[in-house]
UniProtKB/Swiss-Prot annotation:
Keywords: Cytoplasm, Lipid A biosynthesis, Lipid biosynthesis, Lipid metabolism, Lyase. It comes from the Bacteria. GO terms for biological process: fatty acid biosynthetic process; lipid A biosynthetic process. Its EC number is 4.2.1.59. This is 3-hydroxyacyl-[acyl-carrier-protein] dehydratase FabZ. The gene is fabZ. Pfam families: FabA. It catalyses: a (3R)-hydroxyacyl-[ACP] = a (2E)-enoyl-[ACP] + H2O. It comes from Gluconobacter oxydans (strain 621H).
């Protein structure tokens, strides 16, 4: 078995109406994420997905290190992860959920950010923090999906936003 695929007992069928009949892994590593979305260093902002509920929700992980390039200028003497990058990590988690849900129906397409609403930043995120990024699909119609995202560090909400994305290609 390829190490990027979950064992059969950890697979769930895709539940979105647009999805073909395929099995969706419940978790994936960075290699599978990189097969799913086009982002790369320094803009790949999720390290793994620890939960995937096809067509419904997902949890992604971002391990924040002192080596992040954005800390060079935000702020050198007191490093803080920019809030907009936390929202981007939510969007990448959601995009990966879309790709995993749609399977072959997604081939040749990309997920593009459309809107960000009600973004709130509750506390700074810095080196050593692990972001646990929860995204829930609120609804979808045709190629537009709307999500609610919450990022947590040590079970404390640090950021939240509602956002939508469009599948194009």
């Amino acid at each position: 078995m390829d190490r990027v695929d979950a064992p059969a007992e950890q697979m769930t069928p895709a539940t979105d109406a647009a999805a073909d009949s395929h099995q969706v892994p419940q978790s994936i590593d960075i290699l599978k994420i990189m097969q799913s979305i086009p982002h790369r260093y320094p803009f790949l902002l999720i390290d793994k997905m620890v939960e995937i509920h096809a067509g419904q929700s997902a949890i992604g992980i971002k391990n924040v290190t002192v080596n992040e390039p954005f800390f060079q200028g935000h702020f050198p003497s007191h490093p803080v992860m920019p809030g907009v990058l936390i929202v981007e990590a939510m969007a990448q988690t959601a995009a990966t959920l879309v790709v995993m849900t749609l399977g072959k129906a997604f081939e040749g397409k990309l997920v593009y950010f459309m809107t960000i609403e009600n973004a709130k930043f509750r506390r700074p995120v810095g080196p050593g923090d692990q972001l646990r990024i929860h995204v829930d699909k609120e609804r979808s119609r045709a190629n537009v999906w709307k999500f609610k995202g919450v990022a947590r560090v040590d079970d404390v909400a640090v950021a939240e936003a509602t956002f939508s994305a469009m599948i194009m290609g």
